[in-house]
Amino acid sequence: MDLRRLAGWPLLGLLMVGPGLALAAGKCERLIATGSPDAPPYLWQDPQDPKHLIGAGADLLTQVAAQLGIKIELLYAGKRAQALDEVRSGRMDLLTDAPLTTTGLEALDYVHPPLLENDYLVWTRKDSTLVINRPEDLHGHTGALSEKSRMTAGFGVFAEQQLSLTRTPNLTQAFQKLLLGEVEYVLAGRYSGLAMAQTLGMANDLQAAPQPVDKPGLFLAVSHNSACNDPWLRGQLAQKMTELSASGLAEAVLQRNLERWNTQLQSPVGAPKQ
């Protein structure tokens, strides 16, 4: 038996209670979660405690776990690919910021609705005359996109077929190309773009169109190999995600963590390569 599971009640007690209570009695008392370590304000490595992750995703998941009576720890597991491997193997239970993909479904149980939305906006220089009201307006213009971006499958097909996009290793280089005039726009998340603009000192030089061109969700995803993966946990998480989506709390938490990230920039902490 996994050491994180509660010992449970005596067999006689389990037979006397309803099925819901019997199921809850065997729940995990502790979950280990991870995610991208370089994606502020969603998640990033805690500069004061590098073994842990902080950010909007961590705050929301910690709150949800407390409501369920479960202890949760957000641990740094390495870069994105390493974090995914840790969860797929079951060594860690939960991925906090999983994009919905067909390959992901082979190893993960996604909890709906998503923990956070990640609106992708069109970023341009402040002096740009480019007018974008819909994705089709980008046709014929040169743009850039970080290879680490995780768009929806539908928009990915559209971008591949219809847009002239340069893929860069990270968002830093995409924004630098924009300021140098090598591209006309960059596709980047609303909050990740703001965080990177602050990091690079470009906040006064860039602007973002208000209308998202893509809205990929960032999901909680439980490993198929986690000893804690059971119907009770998935059901409770789904209920809490539904309540969270209706509450409007996520945007306030994102704003707070954007300010938190900006405050950390005042200290000599390395900028993330998104």
Ranges and model annotations:
Residues 124-143, 231:
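Flexible hinge/capping segments at coil-to-helix
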Residues 55-67, 141, 149, 221-260:
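Extended ligand-binding regions for polar small-molecule ligands
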Residues 25-99, 103-107:
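Extracytoplasmic small-molecule ligand-binding "clamshell" domains
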Residues 71, 150-163, 204-205, 239-274:
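Ligand-binding clefts/hinges and TM-proximal coupling segments of bilobed small-molecule sensing domains
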Residues 36-38, 117-121, 200-238, 260-271:
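Periplasmic-binding protein-like
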Residues 81, 98-106, 156-157, 184-215:
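A ligand-binding cleft/hinge motif common to bilobed small-molecule-binding domains
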Residues 44-47, 61-69, 113, 137-139, ...:
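Ligand-binding cleft/hinge of the Venus flytrap
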Residues 29-37, 42-43, 135-150, 242:
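Short loop->beta-strand "edge-of-pocket" segments that line small-molecule binding or catalytic clefts
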